[in-house]
Amino acid sequence: MPPTITFWGVLASPFQLKMQAIADACRLEWRRFPAQANLAEAWMTLLRLRLDGQLGRIRRFGGFTPGLDEYPAVPYYRIDGGPFYYDSSDFAAHLASVEPRAAALIPDDPAMAFVVRLVDEAFDEWGLYMVHHNRWVTSARTNRMAADLVVEMG
């Protein structure tokens, strides 16, 4: 049976959108909280996420590097109601470990896998700044993302 994926993040997050696109490429079903949760689900998930964060139980597939990781500034995900994870770059590898359809996302050739990871990391760093600059600076007078974020989290 395919895994059930729950994402916790805001619509404005490019990392959130990247994880959703990976799940879509694998034809896996997912839900994005808090937007697609009912009130009880949203509150219970938020409380568990906060508690797990305080207790240091939020994980990163592939391991945690103290001082180098972005935790907790990126979206979170859960597979089949398990522990929370973060890091959109490791999401595809995590899916590949639990779902055969996701294995095609990671090339078997180590050199190609390196190139895929390099491009992913480069766009996470460089591309993110272009997105944020356009969203919050260039389009500030015409872009609704700030208002949408307030409504979504409000």
Regions found by a protein language model. Name each.
Residues 1-154:
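GST-like domain detector, emphasizing the conserved glutathione-binding G-site
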